[in-house]
């Protein structure tokens, strides 16, 4: 469902006519070699497209106009090979709507000590050309990612590739919509939010449809399609064959087929459900939701569209990478002193992309929702480094709260727990991490990912110009409290 190859990134090289045609030709040749080398590296998720060397204000403005109008262009990478006076860039940068990465590099890795002359010095001027360019971004208060180092370095390429994945997620969010079936769970605060502001800042179009529309589609699903889907279930999961289980599984298969059809029709990238509004649905969607998350859709329970959008964004960022991403909830604690852990789960809807082993389809009663016993996938989560992230509406801005965590083995069986689960240790430790999370107002609903790290989410928040706070091994609680206070002042003073 998610294809990062559909996007491209425009590589913009700055110079000026002052240097003459011979120098400008060398600039173009060297830029072409850099871009060809980058495109040969499989680390990059999308194609990088070299554009003609930019030498005047009109050329710069025109290229940004074209980038804005091209839905395939997910972002722009800028590099000043020579000195490119930044007043020429003001008009173009002022209209730019695409994420921007400023690559501070130069063609040659080393100084040619024995042969360096003024011709070399005139050609290789990024050391001061990119400083000039950095000033105009700072002066215009523009969001951008800055990557410094030689273009052949592994670390430089890794940072560019991460940012490209983030930019793809931003473009994806601007092109689709989040479908809500029903409203938010009654009386819950943290799942609420300003949907207009979300579309302005995050690009997410969030709209609601009555669950009755979905229920009618479920009833109309052909039995042939159900049987085909059951065959797929048997291949991918451990599936029971008793009559009680099969009846429930068939209902989830119908919900999955109808949901997928509806989401495709609405060009949706994510969706929400709520157990308080099920209308004529036979069950609360469980297995169906897990399967659609596995395909790449974002999801939020109880109407939590912010969680749904964030899950989708991270799934786009992590496409093709090891690990997975899921909707998650901090459910209960293991509070042995010195080994405090969080058990993450939800009633039904945990994505199998984070499964450690082959998931099992199980059918169990569900005490809420008032419907038949739902089928769901049950499994233990993957182990290793992970992130837990929540986006909340603070009234005058969105805040992204990110916690670095370590997913640990679940060493004891939980035979009576009928849901998928993951066990993690928050960084730097349970008490400080949880204190910081609560101080920041992080939600109980999160996006949990073993596919990405914190840098992706920082890049995402900075590109979208929303607040973020990070809880990791470097946390100092007193400094964190000050950061929250300073952020309150900064975001209160900041104009849109």
Swiss-Prot record:
The keyword Protein transport does not apply. GO terms for cellular component: cytosol. One of its GO terms (biological process) is L-arabinose catabolic process to xylulose 5-phosphate. Pfam families: AraA_central (PF24856), AraA_N (PF02610), Arabinose_Iso_C (PF11762). The keyword Isomerase applies. It is an enzyme of class 5 (isomerase). Mn(2+) binds at residues 302, 329, 346, 445. Its EC number is 5.3.1.4. Binds 1 Mn(2+) ion per subunit. Its cofactor is Mn(2+). One of its GO terms (molecular function) is manganese ion binding. It catalyses: beta-L-arabinopyranose = L-ribulose. Gene3D superfamilies: 3.40.50.10940. InterPro entries: Ara_Isoase_C (IPR024664), AraA_central (IPR055390), AraA_N (IPR055389), AraA_N_sf (IPR038583), Fuc/Ara_isomerase_C (IPR004216), Fucose_isomerase_N/cen_sf (IPR009015), Lara_isomerase (IPR003762). Pathway: Carbohydrate degradation; L-arabinose degradation via L-ribulose; D-xylulose 5-phosphate from L-arabinose (bacterial route): step 1/3. Keywords: Arabinose catabolism, Carbohydrate metabolism, Isomerase, Manganese, Metal-binding. Belongs to the arabinose isomerase family. Catalyzes the conversion of L-arabinose to L-ribulose. This is L-arabinose isomerase. It comes from Thermotoga sp. (strain RQ2). The lineage of its organism: Bacteria, Thermotogati, Thermotogota, Thermotogae, Thermotogales.
